[in-house]
């Protein structure tokens, strides 16, 4: 089963894929200019890789849980996925963990690497 995960942020969407059920690979993050453009780009990515299951990071706990959860679920609805199952996975601490994993490996530029590594962690937790 081909699986993808996304870590939805306000500026970037981290993306990771797992094509064999074992190895999770971070992909280039999707820059988010607006939600319609971002949803089109995510949907195109899912179609390109023929993804069958999408795992979406969702915050559990914290002061912004309800608001961010609502925004994330709304964004997923914009994808209009018909043949792709969607599941949600707790994303708590994934951005912090991604920064810890990459400390000293590359500079923390705003190019989305951290976001996609967070998506990788989300998918690894789900697996």
Where are these regions (language model features)?
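Phosphate- and other anionic-substrate recognition elements at nucleic-acid/protein interfaces
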Residues: 2-3, 10-127
